[in-house]
From Swiss-Prot:
This is Carotenoid dioxygenase carX. Its cofactor is Fe(2+). Keywords: Carotenoid biosynthesis, Dioxygenase, Iron, Metal-binding, Oxidoreductase. Induction: The expression is subject to photoinduction. The lineage of its organism: Eukaryota, Fungi, Dikarya, Ascomycota, Pezizomycotina.
Length: 696
């Protein structure tokens, strides 16, 4: 972690400052191309080189990510997962004259309650506490309580006279985007999805599971069409929805879970398409029993028949402060627990226990049946062997963990089951003899302990009396994150998984010190799983393909199960998304779309000049070699989180909209309210402004 080693940071964010060193107040996730950009652009034609595939005509690629409204203080608590949601998209419009495809760039803030409140008040810093504040071991109980009560105070203030935008939901909608049943939705786990309009990326309103704000009222709603949350004092928490909902490409159902601080902690919902309301198919806020506590739960697995909830030992619990722990805390003495249940029967959950880990993203989930008829549910996920990323993405030095390899026994008294596992500090490493050290130095701070690898789990459902993890090992030794598959192969046994990697470090550390993605990977998961089973890979610590990034790049065999596209020097990519070629018969026949930034544009200080721009690259996903087109954008796109491809049919099939959210309308209403109320209202607004400035 070079940044952490070479720079003294603030006492609250890093370590004790050296008395002779003046610490540079620069946060790696607020500088360079991580720095937010505040210019928004309506649909603007772009130039391009190469040939744009006809499959893209009429569609749009959109990527979501955190983009803080203000970041003047580069030394303050900040985390890569913080920030107001901003969408950046490229639409491919067909010209009416010559029929050519014209790419058009657009980017817009998502107008959440927090964003609108922040822009129409005198509040100087984010309304919500930073994740950094919650995970920092040096954060005192007073600091956390102050940040929490400050948020509560500002939420209450936003509901008093003079506010034209009350804060009813605390989501920044900065995580991902998806399409379901005529709606494009932006997500974040601190609130419900937010509907956006394509291709303009305007904000429509919050989606509550039945309808979105800004849509025409539903004339007839079914008796079971209840919204997220239901009723009760804690109903607002049951609106909090995963940042990664899953849409079944066959049935059109959208699967979601809602994660809260209160038992039973997790609820699940299944929303069918509006024209397919078979009895029993719609579920809203159904409890998943057996979750061990409040968890930082970012993703889940979903096959055509089953859902997998991950109860990992990474807690997100305000009550931790009473126990002398951080609100977000990782406990490597506890196991990882995977709850598997039929899609529409969460009450039938079965819990599988194994070694502790962190998983932020799943790649794919599918059902399989042996020749004897035994049923298994399979999961591919990006498995981290530590919680390092949670800390380093906030520029915090991770807690030191002793390396332990003794066997532990953990029991769940509620279920009267026991889980015995070897607490391995890492997945099995190929070690220096295979050349891995060329890219991943084996040091105290950067070794297998911090690796993130594409990992295979097989949950055996054949024996009702025993919950057994039949297989669990890594497919490859290389770092692998931000996974995706061909959309119409999701929830089935997809052969290929696409994702990101890095040639300079490992993801657990690299993302934290703001290293970037310079490799895109295509992994033949089906072949690697078959090899793993044939070689009887070691449970938990096994690794099927032990080659390093360097070795794979040197070999580049035609039949290699791992193909890597390496970007040119100083060029860095973001998460790729697959678009299939028309009438394709082979699973990998299509294109990968992703944003690219050339860091040779950076100033000597490491900052981006105003003239810096990004590109959208279109890569042949079959040979992972040919860049068929590059779209030159009018501005840069900061490194962000997740994107998706919206087809022309998606855009044309959007539900009607009556109204859109607008910052200008909110500002105008505020001015009209003040000017129409005489001196009393003006005096109140003066007092209100002082209160806002007083709390920052």
């Amino acid at each position: 972690m070079k940044f952490l080693q070479q720079n003294s940071f603030t006492q609250t964010s890093m370590s004790q400052p050296h008395e002779d060193v003046s610490p540079p107040l620069r946060h790696p996730y607020l500088t360079g191309n991580f720095a937010p950009i505040h210019k928004t652009t309506n649909l603007t034609p772009c130039t391009y080189s190469g040939c744009i595939p006809p499959e893209l005509t009429g569609g749009q690629y959109v990527r979501n990510g955190g983009n803080p409204v203000s970041h003047q203080d580069l030394g303050k608590d900040a985390h890569w997962f913080d920030g107001d949601g901003m969408l950046s998209g490229v639409a491919f419009r067909k010209a009416s004259i010559d029929g050519k495809t014209i790419p058009e760039f657009v980017n817009q803030y998502i107008l959440t309650d927090l964003y609108l409140s922040r822009k129409t008040t005198s509040i100087a810093s984010p309304i919500m506490p930073s994740i950094t504040t919650l995970v920092n071991p040096l954060s005192t109980m007073f600091q956390i309580m102050f940040a929490t009560f400050r948020t509560i105070f500002l939420v209450i203030l936003s509901n008093l006279p003079g506010s034209q935008q009350a804060i009813k939901r605390i989501s920044v909608a900065n995580t991902a985007v998806l399409y379901h049943d005529g709606r494009a939705l932006a997500t974040c786990e601190s609130g419900p999805p937010m509907r956006i309009q394509l291709p303009s990326l305007d904000t429509v309103g919050w989606f509550d599971g039945v309808e979105a704000e800004g849509e025409p009222e539903i004339s007839q709603a079914g008796s079971d069409d209840s919204p997220f949350g239901g009723s009760g004092i804690f109903s607002f928490m049951k609106e909090w929805t995963t940042g990664h909902p899953k849409v079944d490409p066959v049935t059109g159902e959208m699967l979601l879970y809602h994660n809260t601080f209160m038992p039973p902690y997790v609820h699940c919902s299944v929303l069918p398409k509006s024209n397919e309301k078979a009895p029993g198919h719609r579920l809203v806020n159904q409890p998943v029993l057996g979750v061990s506590g409040a968890r930082m739960m970012h993703d889940f697995g979903a096959s055509r028949s089953h859902t997998i909830i991950m109860d990992l030992p990474l807690s997100l619990d305000p009550l931790n402060t009473m126990k002398g722990k951080e609100v977000v805390a990782y406990d490597p003495t506890k196991p990882s627990r995977f709850g598997v249940f039929p899609r529409h029967l969460p009450s039938s959950v079965r819990w599988f226990h194994t070694a502790p880990c962190c998983i932020f993203h799943t790649a794919n989930t599918w059902d399989s049946q042996s020749s004897e008829g035994e049923l298994s549910v399979n999961l591919l996920a990006c498995r981290m062997t530590s919680s390092t990323l949670v800390y380093t993405a906030g520029n915090i030095r991770p807690p030191v963990r002793s390396r332990c390899t003794q066997a532990r026994v953990w029991s769940d008294e509620r279920e009267e089951t026991a889980c015995r596992y070897k607490e391995a500090p890492a997945l099995e490493s190929p070690g220096e003899s295979t050349g891995l050290a060329d890219y991943f130095p084996i040091t105290a701070e950067s070794d297998d302990y911090d690796q993130c690898r594409l990992y295979y789990y097989e949950f055996d459902l054949a024996m009702e009396s025993r919950n057994h993890v039949k297989s669990q090992w890594a497919l490859s030794a290389i770092p692998f994150e931000f996974p995706s598959v061909r959309p119409d192969r999701e929830m089935q046994e997809a052969r290929y998984i696409y994702g990101c990697s890095t040639s300079t470090s490992c993801f657990g550390v690299a993302l934290g010190r703001a290293d970037k993605v310079d490799l895109l990977v295509k992994m033949d998961a089906k072949t690697l799983i078959q090899r793993g089973k044939k070689m009887n890979a070691t449970s938990i610590t096994g690794c099927v393909d032990r080659r390093s990034v360097c070795e794979i790049l040197q070999e580049q065999r035609k039949d290699d199960p791992i193909n890597i596209f390496r970007l040119p020097p100083n060029h860095y990519a973001q998460e790729p998304r697959f678009v299939p070629r028309a009438c394709s018969t082979e699973e990998d026949d299509g294109y990968l779309l992703f944003y690219v930034f050339d860091e040779s544009q950076l100033l000597p200080s490491g900052d981006c000049p105003p003239s810096a721009t990004s590109e959208l690259w279109i890569l042949d996903a079959k040979n992972m070699r040919d860049v068929v087109a590059k779209v030159r954008l009018p501005q840069r796109v900061p490194y962000g989180l997740h994107g998706t491809w919206f087809s022309s049919q998606d855009i044309e099939s959007q539900r009607s909209v009556e109204s859109l959210r607008s910052l200008e309308v909110v500002q105008r209403k505020k001015e009209e309210w003040v000017n129409s109320g005489g001196q009393i209202r003006k005096s109140w607004m003066v007092l209100r402004e002082k209160l806002e400035k007083a709390v920052g």
